[in-house]
Design a protein with these regions (language model features):
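The feature marks the mature, well-folded catalytic cores of soluble enzymes
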Residues: 1-273
Protein backbone atom coordinates (compact mmCIF):
# COMPACT_ATOMS: atom_id res chain seq x y z
CA UNK A 1 0.00 0.00 0.00
CA UNK A 2 1.33 3.49 -0.82
CA UNK A 3 2.48 5.52 2.15
CA UNK A 4 3.21 8.94 0.63
CA UNK A 5 1.66 11.31 -1.89
CA UNK A 6 2.78 14.49 -3.61
CA UNK A 7 0.41 17.43 -4.15
CA UNK A 8 0.74 20.96 -5.49
CA UNK A 9 -1.09 23.86 -3.81
CA UNK A 10 -3.67 25.56 -6.08
CA UNK A 11 -2.11 29.01 -5.72
CA UNK A 12 -2.24 29.73 -9.45
CA UNK A 13 -5.04 27.35 -10.41
CA UNK A 14 -7.61 28.65 -12.91
CA UNK A 15 -9.46 27.59 -16.04
CA UNK A 16 -7.53 29.56 -18.65
CA UNK A 17 -8.23 27.65 -21.86
CA UNK A 18 -10.17 24.57 -22.98
CA UNK A 19 -8.00 21.46 -22.91
CA UNK A 20 -10.92 19.09 -22.34
CA UNK A 21 -14.74 19.25 -22.59
CA UNK A 22 -15.17 20.06 -18.89
CA UNK A 23 -13.30 23.37 -19.01
CA UNK A 24 -16.14 25.87 -19.43
CA UNK A 25 -16.68 27.60 -16.07
CA UNK A 26 -14.40 29.94 -14.06
CA UNK A 27 -12.93 28.75 -10.76
CA UNK A 28 -13.55 30.27 -7.32
CA UNK A 29 -9.93 30.50 -6.01
CA UNK A 30 -10.86 30.77 -2.34
CA UNK A 31 -13.18 27.77 -2.48
CA UNK A 32 -10.59 25.80 -4.46
CA UNK A 33 -8.03 26.42 -1.72
CA UNK A 34 -10.48 25.25 0.95
CA UNK A 35 -11.32 22.10 -1.00
CA UNK A 36 -7.65 21.34 -1.60
CA UNK A 37 -6.91 21.67 2.13
CA UNK A 38 -9.76 19.27 2.94
CA UNK A 39 -8.36 16.76 0.45
CA UNK A 40 -4.95 17.00 2.10
CA UNK A 41 -6.60 16.36 5.47
CA UNK A 42 -8.48 13.34 4.09
CA UNK A 43 -5.29 11.85 2.64
CA UNK A 44 -3.54 12.35 5.96
CA UNK A 45 -6.47 10.75 7.79
CA UNK A 46 -6.11 7.74 5.49
CA UNK A 47 -2.55 7.27 6.72
CA UNK A 48 -0.70 8.94 3.87
CA UNK A 49 2.19 11.34 4.35
CA UNK A 50 1.43 14.45 2.29
CA UNK A 51 4.38 16.08 0.51
CA UNK A 52 4.16 19.34 -1.42
CA UNK A 53 5.80 20.76 -4.52
CA UNK A 54 5.96 24.53 -4.87
CA UNK A 55 3.46 25.97 -7.35
CA UNK A 56 4.80 28.03 -10.25
CA UNK A 57 3.14 31.18 -11.54
CA UNK A 58 1.45 30.84 -14.96
CA UNK A 59 1.32 27.04 -14.64
CA UNK A 60 -2.36 26.93 -13.76
CA UNK A 61 -2.75 23.15 -14.17
CA UNK A 62 0.28 22.20 -12.07
CA UNK A 63 -2.15 21.36 -9.26
CA UNK A 64 -3.01 18.14 -11.12
CA UNK A 65 0.03 16.28 -9.84
CA UNK A 66 -0.75 12.89 -11.40
CA UNK A 67 0.33 13.78 -14.93
CA UNK A 68 3.89 15.10 -15.08
CA UNK A 69 5.77 11.85 -14.35
CA UNK A 70 5.17 8.14 -13.91
CA UNK A 71 6.53 6.92 -10.57
CA UNK A 72 7.80 3.39 -10.03
CA UNK A 73 10.39 1.23 -8.32
CA UNK A 74 12.55 -1.70 -9.33
CA UNK A 75 14.77 -3.99 -7.31
CA UNK A 76 17.85 -3.12 -9.36
CA UNK A 77 17.56 0.64 -9.81
CA UNK A 78 15.31 1.57 -6.89
CA UNK A 79 12.74 4.36 -7.18
CA UNK A 80 12.40 5.96 -10.60
CA UNK A 81 10.32 8.42 -12.59
CA UNK A 82 9.56 8.56 -16.30
CA UNK A 83 9.01 12.19 -17.38
CA UNK A 84 5.89 12.93 -19.40
CA UNK A 85 5.59 14.50 -22.81
CA UNK A 86 2.37 16.46 -22.46
CA UNK A 87 0.12 17.09 -25.46
CA UNK A 88 -0.49 20.74 -24.52
CA UNK A 89 2.59 23.03 -24.47
CA UNK A 90 1.43 24.89 -21.36
CA UNK A 91 1.33 21.62 -19.43
CA UNK A 92 4.70 20.47 -20.76
CA UNK A 93 6.23 23.41 -18.87
CA UNK A 94 5.19 21.71 -15.61
CA UNK A 95 7.27 18.60 -16.26
CA UNK A 96 10.80 19.95 -15.46
CA UNK A 97 9.63 21.23 -12.07
CA UNK A 98 8.33 17.79 -11.11
CA UNK A 99 11.38 15.99 -12.50
CA UNK A 100 13.66 18.27 -10.46
CA UNK A 101 11.62 17.58 -7.32
CA UNK A 102 12.04 13.83 -7.72
CA UNK A 103 15.68 13.95 -8.86
CA UNK A 104 16.76 15.96 -5.82
CA UNK A 105 15.19 13.27 -3.63
CA UNK A 106 17.14 10.42 -5.14
CA UNK A 107 14.75 9.10 -7.79
CA UNK A 108 16.36 7.81 -10.96
CA UNK A 109 15.07 9.65 -14.03
CA UNK A 110 14.33 7.45 -17.07
CA UNK A 111 13.99 9.92 -19.93
CA UNK A 112 12.44 8.44 -23.07
CA UNK A 113 13.14 9.52 -26.65
CA UNK A 114 9.53 10.20 -27.54
CA UNK A 115 10.21 12.11 -30.80
CA UNK A 116 6.82 13.74 -31.26
CA UNK A 117 4.84 11.13 -29.35
CA UNK A 118 2.93 11.85 -26.13
CA UNK A 119 2.90 10.22 -22.71
CA UNK A 120 0.93 11.72 -19.82
CA UNK A 121 2.29 10.07 -16.70
CA UNK A 122 0.08 8.78 -13.93
CA UNK A 123 -3.04 10.01 -15.70
CA UNK A 124 -2.72 7.31 -18.34
CA UNK A 125 -0.33 4.88 -16.61
CA UNK A 126 -1.83 3.02 -13.65
CA UNK A 127 -0.05 0.37 -11.62
CA UNK A 128 -2.04 -2.75 -10.92
CA UNK A 129 -2.27 -2.72 -7.10
CA UNK A 130 -0.01 -5.78 -6.79
CA UNK A 131 2.53 -4.16 -9.14
CA UNK A 132 2.25 -7.09 -11.55
CA UNK A 133 1.69 -4.79 -14.55
CA UNK A 134 0.95 -1.26 -15.70
CA UNK A 135 -2.39 -0.45 -17.34
CA UNK A 136 -1.79 2.16 -20.04
CA UNK A 137 -4.41 4.30 -21.75
CA UNK A 138 -3.90 5.95 -25.13
CA UNK A 139 -5.83 7.65 -27.89
CA UNK A 140 -6.85 11.01 -26.43
CA UNK A 141 -3.79 12.43 -24.62
CA UNK A 142 -1.07 9.75 -24.63
CA UNK A 143 -0.30 8.42 -28.10
CA UNK A 144 0.06 4.79 -29.09
CA UNK A 145 3.67 5.44 -30.10
CA UNK A 146 4.41 7.00 -26.72
CA UNK A 147 3.05 3.94 -24.95
CA UNK A 148 5.13 1.64 -27.14
CA UNK A 149 8.31 3.45 -26.12
CA UNK A 150 7.22 3.37 -22.48
CA UNK A 151 6.46 -0.36 -22.71
CA UNK A 152 9.88 -0.99 -24.23
CA UNK A 153 11.58 0.77 -21.31
CA UNK A 154 9.50 -1.17 -18.79
CA UNK A 155 10.30 -4.46 -20.56
CA UNK A 156 13.95 -4.01 -19.61
CA UNK A 157 12.77 -4.20 -15.99
CA UNK A 158 10.37 -7.11 -16.64
CA UNK A 159 7.35 -4.88 -16.01
CA UNK A 160 4.47 -5.82 -18.35
CA UNK A 161 2.40 -3.01 -19.87
CA UNK A 162 -1.16 -3.56 -21.10
CA UNK A 163 -2.36 -0.90 -23.56
CA UNK A 164 -6.00 0.21 -23.52
CA UNK A 165 -7.47 2.29 -26.35
CA UNK A 166 -9.60 5.19 -25.07
CA UNK A 167 -12.33 6.33 -27.46
CA UNK A 168 -14.32 9.10 -25.71
CA UNK A 169 -12.89 12.62 -25.34
CA UNK A 170 -14.66 13.09 -22.01
CA UNK A 171 -12.48 10.30 -20.62
CA UNK A 172 -9.20 11.64 -21.90
CA UNK A 173 -7.03 9.94 -19.27
CA UNK A 174 -7.25 6.36 -18.03
CA UNK A 175 -7.72 7.56 -14.44
CA UNK A 176 -11.09 9.07 -15.43
CA UNK A 177 -12.58 5.71 -16.47
CA UNK A 178 -10.71 2.99 -14.52
CA UNK A 179 -10.12 2.87 -10.78
CA UNK A 180 -8.39 -0.10 -9.13
CA UNK A 181 -9.93 -0.98 -5.76
CA UNK A 182 -7.54 -3.81 -4.89
CA UNK A 183 -5.51 -6.46 -6.73
CA UNK A 184 -8.66 -8.31 -7.79
CA UNK A 185 -11.28 -5.62 -8.37
CA UNK A 186 -11.77 -2.33 -10.20
CA UNK A 187 -14.56 0.00 -11.26
CA UNK A 188 -14.72 1.20 -14.86
CA UNK A 189 -16.85 2.94 -17.44
CA UNK A 190 -17.09 0.53 -20.42
CA UNK A 191 -18.02 3.23 -22.94
CA UNK A 192 -14.63 4.91 -22.58
CA UNK A 193 -12.83 1.87 -24.02
CA UNK A 194 -12.60 0.12 -27.36
CA UNK A 195 -14.06 -3.39 -27.49
CA UNK A 196 -10.56 -4.88 -27.45
CA UNK A 197 -9.63 -2.81 -24.40
CA UNK A 198 -12.76 -4.02 -22.61
CA UNK A 199 -11.67 -7.60 -23.25
CA UNK A 200 -8.20 -6.84 -21.88
CA UNK A 201 -9.75 -5.47 -18.72
CA UNK A 202 -12.02 -8.47 -18.29
CA UNK A 203 -9.00 -10.73 -18.52
CA UNK A 204 -6.98 -8.75 -16.01
CA UNK A 205 -9.42 -8.42 -13.10
CA UNK A 206 -11.40 -11.05 -11.21
CA UNK A 207 -14.15 -8.53 -10.51
CA UNK A 208 -15.00 -5.53 -12.69
CA UNK A 209 -17.77 -3.19 -11.61
CA UNK A 210 -19.26 -1.14 -14.47
CA UNK A 211 -20.68 2.32 -13.85
CA UNK A 212 -22.91 4.29 -16.20
CA UNK A 213 -21.95 7.36 -18.19
CA UNK A 214 -23.59 9.87 -15.85
CA UNK A 215 -21.68 8.47 -12.87
CA UNK A 216 -18.46 8.43 -14.85
CA UNK A 217 -18.91 12.05 -15.92
CA UNK A 218 -19.16 12.81 -12.19
CA UNK A 219 -15.65 11.36 -11.74
CA UNK A 220 -16.70 8.21 -9.87
CA UNK A 221 -13.63 6.47 -11.31
CA UNK A 222 -11.25 9.23 -10.23
CA UNK A 223 -11.00 8.22 -6.58
CA UNK A 224 -8.25 6.73 -4.44
CA UNK A 225 -8.44 3.34 -2.71
CA UNK A 226 -6.18 3.35 0.36
CA UNK A 227 -6.23 1.85 3.86
CA UNK A 228 -9.68 0.31 3.55
CA UNK A 229 -11.20 3.52 2.22
CA UNK A 230 -12.14 5.01 -1.12
CA UNK A 231 -11.66 8.76 -1.28
CA UNK A 232 -14.05 10.22 -3.85
CA UNK A 233 -15.75 13.50 -4.68
CA UNK A 234 -19.24 11.97 -4.67
CA UNK A 235 -20.92 8.66 -3.91
CA UNK A 236 -23.08 7.19 -6.69
CA UNK A 237 -25.28 4.07 -6.45
CA UNK A 238 -23.00 1.82 -8.54
CA UNK A 239 -19.90 3.05 -6.75
CA UNK A 240 -21.47 2.57 -3.33
CA UNK A 241 -22.47 -0.99 -4.26
CA UNK A 242 -18.97 -1.84 -5.50
CA UNK A 243 -17.33 -0.41 -2.39
CA UNK A 244 -19.68 -2.37 -0.15
CA UNK A 245 -18.84 -5.61 -1.94
CA UNK A 246 -15.11 -4.90 -1.67
CA UNK A 247 -15.43 -3.85 1.99
CA UNK A 248 -14.19 -0.32 1.38
CA UNK A 249 -15.54 2.65 3.32
CA UNK A 250 -16.35 5.75 1.22
CA UNK A 251 -14.76 9.04 2.23
CA UNK A 252 -16.39 11.88 0.31
CA UNK A 253 -14.37 15.05 -0.27
CA UNK A 254 -15.85 17.83 -2.42
CA UNK A 255 -13.35 18.96 -5.06
CA UNK A 256 -15.92 20.41 -7.45
CA UNK A 257 -13.83 23.50 -8.23
CA UNK A 258 -11.12 21.26 -9.68
CA UNK A 259 -13.65 19.23 -11.62
CA UNK A 260 -14.38 22.41 -13.58
CA UNK A 261 -10.97 21.75 -15.12
CA UNK A 262 -11.65 18.07 -15.75
CA UNK A 263 -9.87 16.49 -12.79
CA UNK A 264 -10.91 15.13 -9.42
CA UNK A 265 -9.33 13.42 -6.41
CA UNK A 266 -6.97 11.02 -8.20
CA UNK A 267 -5.74 13.69 -10.62
CA UNK A 268 -4.63 15.94 -7.78
CA UNK A 269 -1.94 13.67 -6.36
CA UNK A 270 0.80 11.27 -7.31
CA UNK A 271 1.93 8.36 -5.17
CA UNK A 272 5.60 8.42 -4.19
CA UNK A 273 5.97 4.68 -3.57
Amino acid sequence: MPSQVLLCPPTYFEVRDRKNPYMRVPVDPELAQQQWERLCAALHAAGLQVNLIDPVQDLEDMVFAANQVFVGSHKQIGKFVVPSEMRFPSRQKEVPHYVDWFATRGYNVIALELRGEYLEGGGDLLWHPDRSRVWAGYGIRSSEGGLKRFASAMAHMQIPVTSLHLVDEYFYHLDTCLSPLNAEAAIFYPGAFSSQAQEELKGGWKRLYPIDREEALGFACNGIAVDGRYITSRLTPSLESALRQEQLDPLVVDVSEFEKSGGSVFCMKTFLD
